[in-house]
């Protein structure tokens, strides 16, 4: 089976015929706890008082978190709402606050990068909504996908866009496997500094390589 992936750079806002669904309906992976106050944060509120102030700032960052889903759509897009929408001089915006779409090549059991959402500055105003058409001209068969979230920003919500008549479901393949989790703690390198895009944070690369969260 050959899946032809044609990444594109057009804003999803400009295209008709999409149906958007809230990403919390699907599988959120690479979190240590499920009882966080928001779906895309990494630490439960009960542990915040014991964290340093700089660690609390990182609490809202979605580094390493991804959403798994399956669809037969010929086009895939996303819209997401950034918490801060700030920038850093020493790191690409695609790493700070972009998103990455990956496709599971089931014949090789390998995740392949499809495309990256390149954030629009929008005057660096907080509460910024970003839109991206990742890919079009797919084969219309059911495939497995994953969207990685920003490394040095957080999101309030994420919507996945597909063709209006397409199926959009929970993943049908168990990848990553449900057999324990890997704990990663360290310097800013583990957070993702200064990866060029969000799928290249060490925790995400380990997840794809070993098929574990």
Language model features with spans:
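Bacterial N-terminal signal peptides
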Residues: 1-7
């Amino acid at each position: 089976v050959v899946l032809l992936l044609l990444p594109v750079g057009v804003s999803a806002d400009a295209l008709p015929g999409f149906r958007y669904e809230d990403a919390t309906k699907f599988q959120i992976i690479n979190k240590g706890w499920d009882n966080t106050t928001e779906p895309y944060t990494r630490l439960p509120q009960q542990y915040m008082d014991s964290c340093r102030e700089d660690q609390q700032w990182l609490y809202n960052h979605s580094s390493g978190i991804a959403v798994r889903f399956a669809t037969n759509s010929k086009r895939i897009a996303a819209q997401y709402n950034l918490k801060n929408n700030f920038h850093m001089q020493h790191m690409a915006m695609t790493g700070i606050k972009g998103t990455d779409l990956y496709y599971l090549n089931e014949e090789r059991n390998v995740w392949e990068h499809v495309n990256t959402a390149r954030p629009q500055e929008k005057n660096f105003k907080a509460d910024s909504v970003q839109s991206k058409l990742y890919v079009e001209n797919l084969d219309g068969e059911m495939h497995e996908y994953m969207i990685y979230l920003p490394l040095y920003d957080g999101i309030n919500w994420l919507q996945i866009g597909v063709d209006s008549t397409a199926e959009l479901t929970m993943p049908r393949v168990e990848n990553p496997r449900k057999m324990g989790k890997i704990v990663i703690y360290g310097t800013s390198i583990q957070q993702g500094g200064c990866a060029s895009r969000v799928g290249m944070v060490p925790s995400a690369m380990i997840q794809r390589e070993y098929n574990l969260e």
